[in-house]
């Protein structure tokens, strides 16, 4: 699923503008006082999301249930490389191959295809596209902070 995605919920069908909507399975829910950590497996990729306990309860999130990792393109950062970085606090590091580069007037869109076939797209300033070597065919890492990854359910 990509961009303007139709989703069904108790509130009815809605469409969202988030560029990245990845279907997976919840592998763990860590309960906290105010926030919790939800782990979701999307293809071969393990992702984590820090969301409020209220959201965990409202969505009735449980281990083993299907869910969506929702990431706005503006929340995706990029780095050069073919291995996750070990000196970075962001938990979600998705290694892939650059498959699309679309420069705009000041910033552009870059898409990576992951080993499992999932695609993640992010926004990046044009000068950084060149500086990071984000060219079709090159390896890169899409980085998303756990606080920037939303969870959705049907």
Question: Where does each model-flagged region fall?
Answer:
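Short aromatic-glycine-enriched beta-strand elements
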Residues: 33-39, 105-112
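Glycine/charge-rich catalytic "coupling/switch" loops of P-loop NTPases
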Residues: 2-23, 28, 46, 53-108, ...
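Glycine-centered tight beta-turn/hairpin loop motif at sheet-sheet or coil-to-beta transitions
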Residues: 42-44, 115-117
């Amino acid at each position: 699923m990509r961009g303007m995605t139709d989703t069904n919920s108790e509130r009815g069908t809605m469409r969202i503008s988030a560029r990245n909507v990845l279907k997976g399975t919840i592998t763990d829910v860590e309960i906290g006082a105010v926030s919790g950590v939800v782990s979701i497996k999307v293809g071969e990729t393990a992702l984590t999301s820090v969301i409020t306990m209220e959201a965990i309860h409202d969505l009735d999130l449980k281990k083993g249930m299907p869910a969506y990792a929702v990431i706005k393109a503006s929340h995706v950062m990029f780095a050069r490389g073919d291995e996750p970085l070990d000196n970075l606090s962001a938990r979600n590091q998705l290694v892939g191959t650059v498959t699309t580069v679309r420069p705009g007037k000041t910033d552009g869109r870059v898409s990576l295809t992951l080993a499992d076939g999932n695609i993640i797209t992010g926004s990046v300033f044009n000068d950084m596209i060149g500086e990071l070597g984000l060219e079709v065919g090159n390896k890169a890492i899409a980085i998303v902070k756990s606080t920037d990854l939303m969870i959705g359910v049907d």
